[in-house]
């Protein structure tokens, strides 16, 4: 379910590159829509990096993104990837605890 939620978000950030959803709601509302129960959550978004290695390098070199990845309180991760018609890659990591 978490990967499905991340996939939804990857498609959404292709429309609007933001932690806010295209309909104006918080990005984490996708978790509730998918029936995911959590006490804490985080989201990393990226676009343009064509390989998983490159997107991870970018996130690990960014303090805020790295903090999410290394947060020991998060117990689950879902990853979404979407390649738009122009060939731009969109990536999402969703974390929950």
Task: Map each language-model feature to its residues.
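Disulfide-stabilized extracellular recognition modules
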Residues: 46-97
């Amino acid at each position: 379910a978490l990967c499905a939620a991340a996939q939804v978000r990857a498609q959404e950030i292709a429309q609007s590159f933001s932690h806010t959803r295209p309909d104006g709601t918080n990005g984490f509302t996708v978790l509730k829509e998918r029936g995911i129960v959590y006490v804490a959550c985080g989201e990393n978004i990226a676009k343009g990096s064509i390989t998983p290695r490159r997107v991870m390098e970018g996130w690990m070199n960014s303090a805020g993104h790295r903090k999410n990845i290394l947060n020991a309180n998060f117990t689950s991760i879902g990853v979404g990837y979407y390649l738009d018609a122009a060939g731009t890659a969109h990536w999402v990591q969703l974390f929950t605890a």
